[in-house]
Structures are given as C-alpha cells and as structure tokens.
Design a protein with these regions (language model features):
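Short, polar/charged alpha-helical segment
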Residues: 24-44
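Short, well-ordered alpha-helical microsegments
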Residues: 87-89, 127, 153, 184, ...
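Extracellular glycoside hydrolase catalytic/binding regions
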Residues: 99-130
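An alpha-beta-alpha
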Residues: 120-176
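Extracellular/periplasmic bilobed ligand-binding domains
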Residues: 161-163, 167-232
C-alpha cells in the first residue's frame, strides 16, 4: 500500500472519564460526523481519515504519554483535542512542533506555538463581552468567581478581574476547588457572605452540574445570577 493509500490517523483526545467525561459522548459524535463529512468529500488529499480515540479525562501526564507513544510508533499523523487546558499543555511538552495539533475547546487566550491551532473561544470573544452584556441587561455590577483549580479557570478569573475593574464593576473575590469536587458547602457559604449580583462559574462538567444544583437548593439563585461559558 502506497503512502497516498494509507489513512490519515488522528489522535482524537476527548474526555471519557472524570469531571469532563460528561462531554465525551458529544465530542465523539462530533468526531464521527466530521469524519463522515470528510469521507463524502473524498477525504483529505484523497486519503481517508481514521480517529484513534485517546481518553483525555485522565491525568494530563498519562494522556500526553499515550499521545507521545502513538507518535513515536508512527501510529498517528496529527492530534485533535477537546479537553482541559492542563492536558493541552502537557501534550505540547511531548509533541509540540512535531505534529499538527488542533485544540477545539475554549481557552485562556492567544498562543503562538508552532503547529498548534486554537479553534475554540478566547476570553476576549466570549467571557469578557458577556460580563458587559450582563451588566447592561441585568444590572450585574458585583461579581464572584468560582472555578476548578487549574490553569484555564485561574487565567480566565485573572482576565475577568482586570476587565471588571476597567469597566467600573467590582470583583468581590475568587475561589477554586479541585477537579472532582462533590461538596460545595464551603463555597456556597462564601458566596452567601459576599452576596454578589452574579457568579462567573468556571467549573468543568460534572463539577458544574453539582455546583448548580447545590446553588439552587441553597436558594442563591434568588440572589445571584450565574454565568458559565461551558456547560453541557
């Protein structure tokens, strides 16, 4: 079989487990749809596309090592991922600049890493304009931030804090919890003390669902708006 007859094999890194595992079925369906549409058009450069599923819901180092092993074995030609930023950063440590890498999830901002293509929403195009809109439409002037404790929520929170100050709004504080948190009692107590007009929720997947339900049970939905840029 000649090179042109071989499929283009893509490591498709999506969460199958963990907090972000709730997004897994949607991600896999999108991948299948993309392959079907490309196949109808003759593939890419006349070659079929084959997805190699990599579970991006595990520890970042474990995910990155699997991608690197596939690359070194000649088993993949590119990487496409919808997963958390901590996984992206680790994958880049192993294959950055070596393989085309399309990162489809929302992210912290612009990057200029060779071979990395960011197609998801940046804070300047999504979160920050939404803060302004919520102020205009609902009078949300005071804000708290609740997020998971890793790079994306922390960097978005920092961008939001600076934006709020520049736009004449108030940032009352931020709190971060580990991925997989199930008990948000302390977080809800903290929100009750601050009583913000709105809460920017930077929690992932199942964590966001559990927080939202606990927030409503506490009756905080009668006091504060919630805005989340990522919720299944």
């Amino acid at each position: 079989m000649t090179h042109r007859e071989l499929p283009i094999r893509i490591a498709y890194v999506v969460p199958v487990q963990g907090s972000a595992g709730i997004f897994g079925p949607s991600c896999e369906a999108c991948g299948d749809l993309a392959v079907a549409e490309l196949s109808c058009g003759g593939g890419v450069l006349g070659r079929e596309i084959e997805l190699v599923i990599v579970d991006g819901g595990r520890r970042p180092a474990v995910v990155a090592q699997e991608v690197a092993t596939l690359w070194r074995a000649g088993a993949i030609d590119a990487v496409v991922g919808w997963h958390i930023s901590a996984v992206r950063k680790e994958i880049l440590r192993y294959v950055g600049g070596e393989l085309p890498y399309v990162y489809a999830a929302l992210h912290e901002g612009e990057f200029r890493t060779p071979g990395l293509f960011m197609t998801g929403e940046s804070p300047g195009a999504q979160v920050l304009p939404a803060l302004d809109w919520l102020r205009r439409q609902f009078g949300a002037h005071t804000w708290c931030v609740v997020g998971n404790d890793y790079v994306w929520p922390r960097q978005i929170a920092a961008r939001a804090e600076a934006h709020l100050a520049g736009a004449g709004m108030s940032h009352l504080g931020s709190t971060f919890t580990p991925l997989g948190t199930s008990d948000f009692t302390e977080t809800l107590d903290w929100l009750e003390v601050h009583g913000p007009d709105a809460v920017l929720v930077l929690l992932i997947g199942d964590d966001a669902v559990r927080f939202g339900r606990a927030f409503a049970r506490r009756g905080l939905d009668e006091i504060s708006l919630r805005f989340s840029p990522i919720l299944e």
